[in-house]
Amino acid sequence: MTQFASPVLHSLLDTDAYKLHMQQAVFHHYYDVHVAAEFRCRGDDLLGIYADAIREQVQAMQHLRLQDDEYQWLSALPFFKADYLNWLREFRFNPEQVTVSNDNGKLDIRLSGPWREVILWEVPLLAVISEMVHRYRSPQADVAQALDTLESKLVDFSALTAGLDMSRFHLMDFGTRRRFSREVQETIVKRLQQESWFVGTSNYDLARRLSLTPMGTQAHEWFQAHQQISPDLANSQRAALAAWLEEYPDQLGIALTDCITMDAFLRDFGVEFASRYQGLRHDSGDPVEWGEKAIAHYEKLGIDPQSKTLVFSDNLDLRKAVELYRHFSSRVQLSFGIGTRLTCDIPQVKPLNIVIKLVECNGKPVAKLSDSPGKTICHDKAFVRALRKAFDLPHIKKAS
């Protein structure tokens, strides 16, 4: 399988913004921490046959480096420090940190090494997997079809929002990791740029080249790693929130809530955290229930919800975003991150439901116990039990 051996990726910045934000925090706070992460396909796709092609792409990634114009652009952003950017200039992907194999038809991928380096593999590697699989499965699909689908959905969107005050509606592209291709994502984002409510992209390469605002703060792995970094498991989520504020005292302040369920998060999200963080991000569970809990929590703490932002990013499409906007827009600031339903929305193309998640930190297990049972990840059942006990979680959800 070498007919598509040309590199999929052309820029080190072809990744999600929060990866660089987290990498800088790891560089400054946890330079010597080691981690392991694993690939998961949440669907029934047997992707093992693509292992050789993916391995070739992994080897090609070692040639990516931060270019001078990219370095200058990052330097102009308000939250990156010179020591980190100078280190990033010298960074190269190390393919020895990645094992890719065909396990009886299933694609098996494991990453391991220093967290400061391993952290950058996830998003571009998922984008590579998605693009390689779609090249083989859907050679007939093209950019024009993706654009036609978007245009049709924008017509529906206009009808759906007719007469609605859209001044508080903000949409972001979160579509890098499961895109049909790099070309499709860029085309979709360029089209969305024409809409007044489109405010940015999570992709740093696109943000730089298209003069867009880069969007993103932190991911589950930030909270997961602290389960072993923090000496007290019950305090690990608060430790993660506090360490983030040390790195970014007054910027990049949207906190992800579902590493150990929303209820457990809110118990840790006291008045100081709630005041200093600019808002919260939803990534699993019922979005209306989650939003109501968030607003009630702010009100209980004496904080005006209108001063905070709720970001919705779980399996969204334009219609769902409008439904949530109608429900919440008068009470809180809102942003919506849409991924797969923008960048892999082509007739007869089945998007991949794929992730890469942390499974170990410093040789010990970590877990994600989200608000959606199917998103729970951990190998070690004893650790899951310890985590549930530490965070007083009432019912068992299957670890996968």
From Swiss-Prot:
Give one Pfam family: NAPRTase
Catalytic activity, EC:
6.3.4.21
Broadest EC class assigned to this enzyme: ligase
Sorted alphabetically, which keywords does the UniProt record give? Ligase, Phosphoprotein, Pyridine nucleotide biosynthesis
The superkingdom of the source organism is Bacteria
* GO annotation, cellular component aspect: cytosol
Q: What pathway does the annotation place this protein in?
A: Cofactor biosynthesis; NAD(+) biosynthesis; nicotinate D-ribonucleotide from nicotinate: step 1/1
Q: Does the keyword Ribonucleoprotein apply?
A: no
Q: Which residues carry this modification: Phosphohistidine?
A: 220
**Enzymatic reactions:** nicotinate + 5-phospho-alpha-D-ribose 1-diphosphate + ATP + H2O = nicotinate beta-D-ribonucleotide + ADP + phosphate + diphosphate
SUPFAM superfamilies reported in the protein's UniProt record: Nicotinate/Quinolinate PRTase C-terminal domain-like, Nicotinate/Quinolinate PRTase N-terminal domain-like
Q: Which InterPro entries match?
A: N/Namide_PRibTrfase, NAPRTase_N, Nic_PRibTrfase, Nic_PRibTrfase-Fam, Nicotinate_pribotase-like_C
The alphabetized list of GO BP terms reads: NAD biosynthetic process; NAD biosynthetic process via the salvage pathway; response to heat
What family, per the record?
Belongs to the NAPRTase family.
The free-text function statement in the UniProt record for this protein reads:
Catalyzes the synthesis of beta-nicotinate D-ribonucleotide from nicotinate and 5-phospho-D-ribose 1-phosphate at the expense of ATP.
- What's the protein name? Nicotinate phosphoribosyltransferase
What is the scientific name of the source organism? Escherichia coli (strain K12)
- The encoding gene: pncB
